[in-house]
Swiss-Prot record:
Keywords: Cytoplasm, DNA replication, DNA-directed DNA polymerase, Nucleotidyltransferase, Transferase. It comes from the Bacteria. It comes from Ureaplasma parvum serovar 3 (strain ATCC 700970). GO terms for molecular function: 3'-5' exonuclease activity; DNA-directed DNA polymerase activity. PANTHER family: DNA POLYMERASE III SUBUNIT ALPHA. This is DNA polymerase III subunit alpha. GO terms for cellular component: cytoplasm.
Length: 969
């Protein structure tokens, strides 16, 4: 039987159409006992391939194809040692290290498929001389059958950024598909086929799982890690409780001893010490770390080590949700770090434990429908407008199923008939890895050399990157650490620094009032723009109903506001405000469910209920909770029987037991992690506190972090007006990339990075130019920018958006004279004639209104509109007998009252010679045109540019014409 022994999968990255499942399917369909994988240079798919082969009772043949001394070799692992050697070689290849293959490779079979290299080993074979004693039957496989050749060529075209026609005409890949026995007999000599069968009997690799391989925290210390951990925890607990020896609450002492015993028994002491160490590094270097994330916030050990900042006993959090004696997997402490400095913490880990013991984690960017259509469309030379139209009609839910997308969309059906080749090739590319990436948060650590355990390659900053993706790492004993960058922590850090710079105050967020009535009043009124977790419209509605009064309430709201639990919000609110009666099964369950008014909100409540009612131990209770969340019916059937029997033995009656079980079963899988929810609620509270008491600093930082999002920017700018904060445009005399504040004047000024087209390099150039110069008037600033090689065009933009307005010279004057100023500044010490500035028109700032379009173009908004946005709140609705309507409500039947700011007025003539006036206005932050006809031209005298009015407006022949002026604001 012929076995294809040089098969490439799509993990060769755009060099094969074959998925691992395709390899397995071919072997099964053809009743072959072996299946082979020999990807080019890498081992990305090795473990997925091995697992799936074993699951289908196939013998996996693991190989590696690579270039060596001008030859193309394929190496195969005969056994586990051979597999480890392939790992080494792949790592060396992918990190550009030179290596030498010795003749005595007992654990490998090596085949030379191209070139003339020779090894003196009985395990060496070649393909070029089919009659030589060491000939072997080998054919490169890149696609399944002849019909898929076009898909393979498309992949090559995408990879090399060429047109498909180029590969159709120049490349011969006719036989690079799976070969059957008949084809193999015609392709290869009997010697080669016999050697193939001989080799197959030698390739019997078994890949072993490995024990946990945690680096030792401090190898130089004679004290064992468990004792170091214990002493750090005891010391940390005293600090946390502000207590001396003998004064520590016994509950804490007992809980700490229990947790340490579990951690020590599982041999996780070093894991906790490593996390403690890098978090301590971060905090010691002014890097803000989140108060906790995930179930780790339920650990007292983590609290004592300052890994988390949530007291688990005070908040009744459960350690076993994080780690229990029966848990087989490693603990998982995820850490939030301010995103701007996350890389510093990761670099610390690389430096402390060494490049050979730390690695980033590989991910794959896989082709989805839209990406495949774009790639294939490009190589087929299809017009981009056509491709855009197709992609626009592929809904996100069909991004992995083009057939279904076509079936559900009429336009796609039509496009399919016009571009069948495009769609058919794209379908077969979906889910193929296009390129590799790096896991957003995770890194791995190992006490042994990582390259001795898994294959690696070069990643970010040439640091090691695993070749195996995340799901295949834990089995090899590698420790994964998730360090997540959280923008909200950076915002907090920036706000605290700005408060210190402007008010000389140092705010310790761990010592603020966590029951501040004004902060909770803000939350109850949903004043939560910019507040982590709490600013979406849906969440605001929930806050208005629930009216949180403490941190736990924030936690509950966050836990309820998810797709499943949302159904319980109404019940929760009704019970909270005593509008709905309810009862508990007994006093024991009351203690568990009372904080959430009888509703299961948290996973920890499930654990406590099961433990209390059925007398399960805490570990079994957590297993029960896991089974429900995963809907594992097999385990649930057994656990249900155990639960009922336990409850009956605990003096519960059968009907009540059944009722309780059904209730738990119905709602438990919606339960949220209490530890995580509570920890994140502290971040929400911190932001709400800073917003209430340091509004100017908070909004300034928030604006700097959201300047790329126009909608959010407008929302936050409008909110600033509600706080009576003035918003000013960027000012060259207060140059800053970010938004800046004037505390005394209650002003926030735009940062220069908000100016469209002003990237990092240009901003650095401007900053450097200003720092090197003596600055006094507008001419000295222009001179400084000129000397700093800032172009005339960019200086013109700075003028157009108002950065020179603070000199009291209007933009029109500066622009009209800019060329002359630019030419004459710095010449023999003579500057532009300053006497010209005395002209009245140079100081008439009202002409700046004509540059509103420039503000919109370069800032995304005209600054006058910010003043307009708040005027809605200043109308005396009691005196007005009408309601302000939206622009789209204007109609032909009656007047619609519209609030608008006038940006510009243009006069024209109709065909009949009548006057007509077009008012360019801003309505709900959108530009709209209103019209005044001849019979109402007298209204023009009452309207000024920049003014805000309530107009009575009607629709006539597509004209939105002004009937009257109701009020000037």
């Amino acid at each position: 039987m012929f076995i294809n022994l040089n098969v490439h999968s799509h993990y060769s990255l755009l060099n094969s159409t074959l998925s691992i499942d395709d390899l397995i399917k071919y072997a099964l369909d053809n009743k072959q006992p072996y299946v082979c994988l020999t990807d080019l240079n890498n081992m990305y798919g090795c473990i997925e391939f091995y697992d799936k082969a074993k699951a289908h009772n196939l013998t996996p043949i693991i190989g590696l194809e690579f270039e060596y001394q001008n030859a193309t070799l394929v190496a195969y692992a005969k056994n586990y040692n051979g597999y480890l050697k392939l790992i080494k070689w792949s790592s060396w290849i992918m990190t550009s290290k030179e290596f030498e293959i010795q003749d005595d490779f007992d654990d490998l079979i090596i085949v030379c498929k191209k070139g003339t290299i020779v090894f003196k080993s009985p395990n060496f074979y070649q393909t070029h001389d089919q009659n030589a004693p060491n000939a072997i039957a080998l054919q490169s496989v890149f696609y399944a059958n002849k019909n898929d050749k076009i898909v393979f060529l498309a992949m090559l075209a995408i990879k090399n950024d060429l047109k498909l026609e180029d590969f159709k005409n120049c490349c011969d890949f006719d036989n690079n598909h799976f070969l059957n026995d008949n084809l193999a007999q015609s392709f290869f000599s009997p010697i080669a086929l016999n050697n193939l069968n001989k080799v197959l009997n030698e390739l019997k690799v078994q890949i072993h799982d490995l024990p946990i391989n945690i680096p030792v925290y401090d190898k130089q210390n004679s004290i064992i890690s468990s004792e170091i951990l214990k002493q750090l925890c005891i010391s940390g607990l005293k600090k946390r409780l502000n207590a001396n020896d003998g004064q520590v609450n016994k509950i804490y002492v007992q809980r700490l001893k229990y947790e340490l015993d579990v951690i020590n028994e599982k041999q996780f002491d070093d894991y906790f010490l490593i996390v403690y160490d890098f978090i301590n590094f971060a905090k010691s270097n002014g890097i803000i770390v989140g108060p906790g994330r995930g179930s780790a916030a339920g650990s007292l050990v983590a609290y004592c080590l300052h890994i988390t900042d949530i007291d688990p006993i005070k908040h009744n959090l459960i350690f076993e949700r994080f780690l229990n004696p029966t848990r087989k997997s490693m603990p998982d402490i995820d850490t939030d770090i301010m995103d701007e400095k996350r890389d510093l913490v990761i670099e610390y880990l690389f430096e402390k434990y060494g490049n050979d013991h730390v690695a980033y984690i590989l991910t794959f960017q896989r082709l989805k429908a839209k990406m495949a259509i774009r790639d294939v469309g490009r190589i087929l030379g299809i017009d981009l407008k056509v491709i855009d139209k197709i992609c626009k009609n592929i809904k996100p839910e069909y991004d992995e199923d083009l057939d279904l997308a076509i079936k559900k969309n009429t336009i796609l059906k039509e496009m399919y008939l016009l571009h069948k080749e495009l769609f058919e090739i794209s379908k077969k590319l979906i889910n193929a890895p296009r390129q590799i990436g790096t896991h957003a948060a995770g890194i791995i650590l190992s006490d042994s050399l990582i390259s001795n355990i898994i294959p690696i390659q070069l990643g970010i900053n040439d640091r090691p990157l695993s070749q195996y993706s995340m799901e295949y790492l834990e089995r090899f004993g590698l420790i994964k650490m998730d360090l997540l960058g959280l923008k909200n922590l950076t915002i907090i850090d920036n706000v605290l620094k700005m408060i210190y710079e402007n008010q000389n105050k140092k705010i310790d967020l761990f010592n603020i009032n966590y029951n501040d009535k004004f902060v909770f009043e803000d939350l109850a009124k949903a004043r939560t723009n910019g507040i982590f977790q709490l600013e979406s419209p849906g969440m605001k509605k929930v806050l208005l109903k629930v009216k949180p009064q403490n941190i736990e309430d924030i936690s509950i709201v966050s836990a309820l506001f998810r797709p499943g639990p949302q159904q319980n919000i109404k019940t929760f609110v009704e019970r909270r405000f005593k509008r709905e009666e309810f009862s508990y099964w007994n006093e024991a369950t009351r203690k568990i469910l009372e904080p959430t008014y009888g509703i299961i909100v948290y996973q920890e409540q499930v654990i406590e209920l099961v433990k209390t009612i059925a007398n399960f131990d805490i570990a079994t209770s957590d297993n029960f909770r896991r089974a429900i969340s995963k809907k594992d019916e097999k385990i649930l059937i057994q656990l249900k029987d155990d639960f009922i029997n336990g409850a009956l033995n605990n003096n519960y009656k059968q009907p009540l037991v059944n009722q309780i079980f059904e209730y738990i079963f119905s709602f438990a899988h919606y339960g949220f992690n209490h530890s995580h929810s509570l920890a994140y609620s502290y971040i929400s509270y911190w932001l709400a506190y800073l917003k209430h008491y340091y509004t100017l600093e908070f909004l300034s930082v928030l604006l700097s972090h959201t300047s790329a999002s126009k909608d959010k920017l407008l929302s936050y700018l409008n909110e600033a007006k509600e706080f009576n904060i003035s918003i000013k445009g960027p000012d060259i005399q207060y140059f800053s990339n970010d938004f800046v504040i004037d505390t005394q004047k209650q002003i926030i000024r735009f940062g220069f990075k908000t100016i469209k087209g002003f990237g990092d390099e240009l901003l650095k150039k401007i900053k450097s130019a200003l720092q090197k110069s003596t600055l006094s008037d507008y001419i000295s600033y222009i001179d400084a920018l000129k000397k700093g090689n800032v172009s005339l065009k960019n200086i013109e933009i700075l003028i157009r958006v108002g950065t020179f307005d603070s000199f009291g010279i209007n933009r029109l004057f500066l622009l009209n004279n800019l060329n002359e100023i630019f030419e004459k500044t710095g010449l023999n010490g003579h500057f532009f004639d300053l006497n010209l500035v005395g002209l009245d028109y140079a100081k008439d700032m009202s002409v700046n209104d004509r540059y509103l379009d420039d503000e919109i173009q370069y800032l995304g908004i005209d600054l006058n509109s910010l003043n307009y946005a708040n005027y809605k709140t200043e109308i005396d609705y009691n005196k007005l007998k009408y309601t302000i309507k939206d622009f789209y409500e204007i109609n032909t039947n009656y007047e619609t009252n519209i609030l608008a700011q006038v940006l510009n007025i243009k006069q024209s003539k109709t065909k009949n010679g009548n006057d007509i006036f077009y008012l360019e206005t801003l309505i709900d932050n959108k530009k709209q045109t209103l019209t005044i006809f001849q019979n109402s031209k007298y209204l023009i005298d009452e309207i000024s540019i920049g003014g805000i009015y309530v107009f009575g407006v009607k629709l006539l022949n597509h004209f939105n014409f002004i009937v009257n002026i109701k009020q000037r604001i």
